[in-house]
Amino acid sequence: MKAKKVLSGALAAILLTLTPGVAVCAEEMAGQEQTENTQVLSAQEQENQEKAASYAEKIDTNEISNWPQGPAIYAASGIVMDMNSGAVLYAKKAEEKRYPASITKVLSVLTALQYAKMSDTVVFSEDSISFLQWDDAQIGMKPGEEISMESALYGMLLASANEVSYAVAENVGKQYLNGGYAEFIEEMNRISQELGCTSSNWVNANGLHDDNHYTTAHDMARIAAAAYQNEEFRRLETTLEYKVPPTNLTAEERILDQNHKMLWPENYYYYANAKAGKTGYTDQSKTTLVTMAEGNDMQLAAVVLHTYGVDAYTDTRFMYDYAFTNFERLNLRECETSSDIESQISELR
């Protein structure tokens, strides 16, 4: 070992004496590596600080008198809403506008289901492929390739395929809306508004970042509720694996797996009450998640926006544990007499 150290020292001396350019280059590389490490640490520190600050922010529903106190979460916005009544059981900054990322596809699929049949053919145009970046979620479709609408919707919900989302929007727009992709986006906005979404704007069908593409946790819960009431949507979203049959341009099957970890029984983040959901992520939106669950005779939608990685699952679990512990659906006719109701009315007076 000593011989190696001496040799290394001698070599360094020669480099410094005879080839200063090389020595300087080595120093610059070492400095660059140190700077890069510092930047990585700074990014991690910034994330940790943001998470800590968000975790410390108040929960809006905790401010309601006599309301059960809900848990702190890392997400910037979160909500649990009863999908049948619209009652909000838990809310943290649920009305603030944020980027949804791929949970946009819940609305895209809901829009397509208003018109399309599962047997419809979806044809992939050059436009539906050409915008893709190397790291975008996709299933490798080719221009001119054809799949069924059913396979396409599975591609959107299970694999979060961005080119498939574009192609579905384009094909539904052409076949049913007397237009194309733009008309489908208009219909997404119309349906969103019809559902009571007052703070959302949609400019694409896949959720890739655009400054003008945004929603709120509350609006997203409304959309999730409407989607979950659709039988076809539930069938698609509760599927864990689907095989896209061979196509006119691809001889092999494409195997699609559900991305939502809370739906897989063998996964660490599995949640027995969870029935359906959609994941999302962009650099700007950070992690987003929508989850539909059932329990205590309730159907609930949970949404978290702008959180980090698996925090989306732990946040959702905490919110659902809180909701199922503190709330249940009751039949007022069975629980109250007329005198109870009259007494409550007199108190309100």
State where each predicted segment sits.
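Hydrophobic alpha-helical segments, especially transmembrane helices
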Residues: 3-6, 106, 295
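Sec-dependent N-terminal signal peptides of Gram-positive bacterial secreted proteins and lipoproteins
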Residues: 2-25
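Residues in and immediately flanking transmembrane alpha helices
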Residues: 17-18, 118, 331-334
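Domain-terminus/edge residues, biased toward the C-terminal soluble/receptor-binding domains
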Residues: 197-198, 211-349
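Active-site-adjacent loops and short helices of periplasmic peptidoglycan-processing enzymes
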Residues: 25-218, 227-231
